[in-house]
Amino acid sequence: MLYHLIRPLLFRLDAERAHDVVTAMFRATSRMPLLPRLISALYAWDDPALMVEWAGLRFASPLGVAAGFDKRADLVDALALLGFSHVEVGTVTPRPQPGNPGPRLFRLPEDMALINRLGFNSHGMVAVAKALRARRSRRVIVGVNIGKNRDTPLERAVEDYAATFVALAPLADYVAVNISSPNTPGLRRLHERAALEELLRELMRLNHGLLYPRPIALKISPDETLDQIEEVVRAGCEAGVAAFIATNTTLAREGLRSRLANETGGLSGRPLAPRARQVIRAIYRLTRGTPPVIGVGGVLTADDAYAHIRAGARLVQLYTGMVYAGPAIAREIKRGLAQLLRRDGFVSVTQATGVDAEWEGAIRQRG
């Protein structure tokens, strides 16, 4: 309720400036005496039916924060207080870089969407490593999303991913490999089989050298064809990827009403949801949930999260939803999700995962 009073004021600011204001508030309140306990009492809500396991990690619920919201890894404690089960920080590059010039983040309220062309603005792996060591909360699972520096030639991209992996994997619960941002020139060429195999082979080699190897997830683009996505999934499975994150932002613009619809960058939010679910279903049908899918794109309500789960996602993440619904979004989605599961006779998220993909597959086979 309070956020809906504040939101009109925030929406008068440039979108990136508003994000900075909100995250500064999050950062401050999580460090004040007594306030964290009060915030947790207001926003934390869990239900045993929502518990999910993946790669030896236990998630209190399937709902997490997607990469992009906390690029510096200094909001983990605050986001844990709001009731998210996991936070994916980043994208993190080896060296600090400013990203693209502003303005570079745009709200599309008519479409419940955002367009960003941030361009991997990053404080670099050294600063993020320091922030991860300083975090207080250990009850939230932390993933690190890694990418390459803009000025690194594509033929040397593996070196960037490897350096960031070595620096940050020991400090994280899992690592997400971002090959799909539309805002770094040439990055999506890493979806090509030979380049992807080289990248994953090196990361797996480094991972096997860790005392405790980390699950590695691969974040993919929604703008590839289903045949191309199948090729990426097969390469990932052969390499030993532990999950696929579907999807990143899209370059598509169909059906948008906002006057800002033609801004350059990746589109997120409600318009992405149908395509994200299509990709989630496609991956689930290929893998049968092993490795699982982490669903991202257009999650603003419990119904959205539930649709992703039924399409095949074991975990779901959001970012744009926080902009429009505010800090109570995790609590509201989890409450609604528990009700939806019980309404349909499911005792757990796992039981509901992929039921729509399986049903549609069965229909096609009979047809």
UniProtKB/Swiss-Prot annotation:
<feature type="active site" description="Nucleophile">
    <location>
        <position position="181"/>
    </location>
</feature>
<feature type="binding site">
    <location>
        <begin position="116"/>
        <end position="120"/>
    </location>
    <ligand>
        <name>substrate</name>
    </ligand>
</feature>
<dbReference type="GO" id="GO:0106430">
    <property type="term" value="F:dihydroorotate dehydrogenase (quinone) activity"/>
</dbReference>
<dbReference type="InterPro" id="IPR001295">
    <property type="entry name" value="Dihydroorotate_DH_CS"/>
</dbReference>
<feature type="binding site">
    <location>
        <position position="219"/>
    </location>
    <ligand>
        <name>FMN</name>
    </ligand>
</feature>
<dbReference type="InterPro" id="IPR005719">
    <property type="entry name" value="Dihydroorotate_DH_2"/>
</dbReference>
<comment type="similarity">
    <text>Belongs to the dihydroorotate dehydrogenase family. Type 2 subfamily.</text>
</comment>
<dbReference type="InterPro" id="IPR050074">
    <property type="entry name" value="DHO_dehydrogenase"/>
</dbReference>
<dbReference type="GO" id="GO:0005886">
    <property type="term" value="C:plasma membrane"/>
</dbReference>
<feature type="binding site">
    <location>
        <position position="298"/>
    </location>
    <ligand>
        <name>FMN</name>
    </ligand>
</feature>
<feature type="binding site">
    <location>
        <begin position="319"/>
        <end position="320"/>
    </location>
    <ligand>
        <name>FMN</name>
    </ligand>
</feature>
<comment type="function">
    <text>Catalyzes the conversion of dihydroorotate to orotate with quinone as electron acceptor.</text>
</comment>
<dbReference type="InterPro" id="IPR005720">
    <property type="entry name" value="Dihydroorotate_DH_cat"/>
</dbReference>
<keyword id="KW-0472">Membrane</keyword>
<feature type="binding site">
    <location>
        <position position="145"/>
    </location>
    <ligand>
        <name>FMN</name>
    </ligand>
</feature>
<feature type="binding site">
    <location>
        <position position="247"/>
    </location>
    <ligand>
        <name>FMN</name>
    </ligand>
</feature>
<keyword id="KW-0560">Oxidoreductase</keyword>
<keyword id="KW-0288">FMN</keyword>
<comment type="subunit">
    <text>Monomer.</text>
</comment>
<feature type="binding site">
    <location>
        <position position="178"/>
    </location>
    <ligand>
        <name>FMN</name>
    </ligand>
</feature>
<dbReference type="GO" id="GO:0044205">
    <property type="term" value="P:'de novo' UMP biosynthetic process"/>
</dbReference>
<feature type="binding site">
    <location>
        <position position="269"/>
    </location>
    <ligand>
        <name>FMN</name>
    </ligand>
</feature>
<dbReference type="InterPro" id="IPR013785">
    <property type="entry name" value="Aldolase_TIM"/>
</dbReference>
<keyword id="KW-1003">Cell membrane</keyword>
<keyword id="KW-0665">Pyrimidine biosynthesis</keyword>
<feature type="binding site">
    <location>
        <begin position="248"/>
        <end position="249"/>
    </location>
    <ligand>
        <name>substrate</name>
    </ligand>
</feature>
<comment type="pathway">
    <text>Pyrimidine metabolism; UMP biosynthesis via de novo pathway; orotate from (S)-dihydroorotate (quinone route): step 1/1.</text>
</comment>
<protein>
    <recommendedName>
        <fullName>Dihydroorotate dehydrogenase (quinone)</fullName>
        <ecNumber>1.3.5.2</ecNumber>
    </recommendedName>
</protein>
<dbReference type="GO" id="GO:0005737">
    <property type="term" value="C:cytoplasm"/>
</dbReference>
<feature type="binding site">
    <location>
        <position position="91"/>
    </location>
    <ligand>
        <name>FMN</name>
    </ligand>
</feature>
<feature type="binding site">
    <location>
        <position position="71"/>
    </location>
    <ligand>
        <name>substrate</name>
    </ligand>
</feature>
<keyword id="KW-0285">Flavoprotein</keyword>
<feature type="binding site">
    <location>
        <position position="178"/>
    </location>
    <ligand>
        <name>substrate</name>
    </ligand>
</feature>
<dbReference type="Pfam" id="PF01180">
    <property type="entry name" value="DHO_dh"/>
</dbReference>
<feature type="binding site">
    <location>
        <position position="183"/>
    </location>
    <ligand>
        <name>substrate</name>
    </ligand>
</feature>
<dbReference type="GO" id="GO:0006207">
    <property type="term" value="P:'de novo' pyrimidine nucleobase biosynthetic process"/>
</dbReference>
<feature type="binding site">
    <location>
        <begin position="67"/>
        <end position="71"/>
    </location>
    <ligand>
        <name>FMN</name>
    </ligand>
</feature>
